[in-house]
A protein has these predicted regions:
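Short, low-complexity N-terminal intrinsically disordered segments enriched in polar/charged residues
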Residues: 1-39, 43, 51
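Short linear sequence motifs
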Residues: 27-31, 83, 96, 119
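Exposed beta-sheet edge and beta->alpha loop/turn motif
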Residues: 89-147
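Short solvent-exposed beta->alpha transition segments
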Residues: 47-107
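Unusually extended, aromatic-enriched hydrophobic runs near protein termini
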Residues: 24-25, 49, 143-147
Length: 147
């Protein structure tokens, strides 16, 4: 009987560990999506950016901002994330918020700070989904994201 209890406790521990790991990886998945969007922006790929921002292409103001950002912030160099402040960090269930990201492409160019509208759907422990809705024009280095 004791072996069954130990076995059950081990299985319970493994199941809980797996669920916690899934919850914690949601942060990495969000960050990867935002960084992919920034890479497209740095490469000047506004069409790729619009594919990552569902609904933005149908909104003239959003579409124009994305095209202008991609054109203005395009450049060579290696993208480096200097600071990443997620508005949805460690959300267990769905959440929406602004993620503030400061990034640099090296060289003499100044750092860029932008806000990305992020939505998490579903439960993080079951994978959930990460949806990016919009990216702001560059904001001041000490500015906060709206909302």
């Amino acid at each position: 009987m004791r072996i069954w209890r130990v076995g059950l406790l081990i299985l319970l521990f493994l199941a809980v560990s797996f669920l916690i790991a899934r919850w914690l990886t949601a942060e990495n998945r969000e960050r990867a999506a935002v960084v992919s969007l920034l890479h497209l922006q740095k490469e000047g790929d506004s069409a790729g950016m619009l594919r990552m921002l569902p609904g933005c292409g149908q909104q003239p103001k959003c579409r124009a901002a994305v095209v202008a950002d991609a054109r203005r912030l395009q450049g060579a160099g290696t993208l480096t994330v200097l600071r990443y402040d997620s508005g949805t960090s460690y959300s267990f269930a769905g959440a929406s918020g602004q993620t503030r990201v400061a990034w640099d492409r090296g060289g003499a160019t100044p750092a860029v700070v932008q806000c990305v509208s992020v939505e998490r759907r579903g439960l993080a422990i079951f994978g959930g989904s990460i949806i990016l809705h919009a990216i702001s024009l560059p904001i001041g280095g000490e500015s906060t994201c709206p909302g």
